[in-house]
UniProtKB/Swiss-Prot annotation:
The gene is rnhA. Its EC number is 3.1.26.4. Keywords: Cytoplasm, Endonuclease, Hydrolase, Magnesium, Metal-binding, Nuclease. One of its GO terms (cellular component) is cytoplasm. Its main location: cytoplasm. This is Ribonuclease HI. It is found in: Cytoplasm. PANTHER family: RIBONUCLEASE H1.
Length: 148
């Protein structure tokens, strides 16, 4: 599958204090078109914002399509590709029988992923990748636009 046939999505989360004021950002690219999404929450964590970025980006797509979603979050990457199937089998419990943190968002992400054909890709953050840098700027905008 070529990039021209896929929607390419870059996502990022930001948090000022952890927990604290947080934001999420997503850059969606398709056939030369771009769409920017961002938002924020007054009391959240970086991991929740990373998850929100992916959820909101996938939810913004009105119909099922092939996607390459690029994140700099090892938490999101490992969660969706390694941990989630076992959490579901165990009734949203970890291997140590503890409740999964952020289960509400993992469940929402799982629902969105089921609508599409998603290829996940991890990229190291803050290394100059243009899409990742834009997603980071959008996440910080989400924090900046929160009411004081």
């Amino acid at each position: 599958m070529t990039d021209k046939e896929q929607v390419v999505i870059y996502t990022d989360g930001a948090c000022k204090g952890n927990p604290g004021r947080g934001g999420w950002g997503a850059l969606l690219l398709y056939k030369g078109a771009e769409r920017e999404l961002w938002g924020g929450e007054p009391d959240t964590t970086n991991n929740r914002m990373e998850l929100m970025a992916a959820i909101q980006a996938l939810a913004a797509l009105k119909r099922s399509c092939p996607i390459r979603l690029i994140t700099d979050s090892e938490y999101v990457m490992r969660g969706i590709t390694e941990w989630l199937p076992n959490w579901k089998k165990r009734g949203w419990k970890t291997a140590s029988k503890q409740p999964v943190k952020n289960a509400d968002l993992w469940q929402a992400l799982d629902e969105q992923v089921a609508r599409h054909q998603v290829e996940w890709q991890w990229v190291r953050g803050h290394t100059g990748d243009p899409g990742n840098e834009r997603a980071d700027q959008l996440a910080n905008r989400g924090v900046a636009e929160l009411p004081r």
